[in-house]
Amino acid sequence: ELIVSGTPVYVSIAPSFVANYDGIGITALNDALKKLGFAGAEETAEGAQLVTEQYEKLVADGEHKIIISSCCHTVNTLIQKYYPQALPYLAQVKSPMLAHGEILKKKYPGCHTVFIGPCLSKKAEADAYAGAIDCVLTFEELTGWLKEENIEVCPVSDNAGRSNRAKTRLYPTTSGILRSMNKDNPEYLYMAIDGVENCRNALRDIIDGNVGKCFIEMSACVNSCIGGPAMDKKHEGVIHERRAVDEFAGSGRFDTVELADMTKSLPFISMQKTMPGSKAIEEILRKMNKSDPSQELNCGSCGYDT
């Protein structure tokens, strides 16, 4: 719908694409996406540049005992819902996806934006923080679409990819955020934790006061984003995929536009459910035209006996 609207639609492509599409650089992927009707594709890692700068500022300030990265929406939601005592430690910084969506809209006024990556949780994040990203697709969905249109992504000379060997392309691997940062404050311990259970254990330790001054990169997926649920290729092993990311990255940085505000609200999300009372239930039944107890049938189709 966005494409047929006639408004230019730009893609923010997650840096894990090099692990998902073997031998394919940003130039080849950009060409294929243009054949689908997109105006162009640029790297989410450009937005990660601004995120890294914010993390570096937090570390340099040294005011926070513990800093937890806020790139992974699943980790953010886990903390917001189930570990609210750890919320003060969660960095109030936009994710690379949100930052890059805003960058694209600043560079191309009036455009629509679509994020494509290996993460299902990004769909929820785009809905929760509306405005930066208009739609989210997974690599699986993109590959299916390309097949439907008989578009083959062919390796081509990737001058655009080679000319900008930015270190924020490391983001989709475990420790990738840390490797993109200048870790100049020796007061902090820098660590990367991946996998939901490991994150849960770490959060419990933080809440119990068992953790000293540190910056923690947290990812819900084992092996971080390259282990995402919507990577559509058969995994050839973490070493192969990390190597693909590492070879595409470097020690440089993106020359990107600045954003006025990189903060992100991450409030507590209550899981308490309000149960309707008898009067509310009677009102619901009345709206269903069930005014007699004999009409209150239990079909059991929901799996419960009442």
Label the model's feature ranges.
Residues 2-305:
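Iron-sulfur-associated redox domains of electron-transfer enzymes in respiratory
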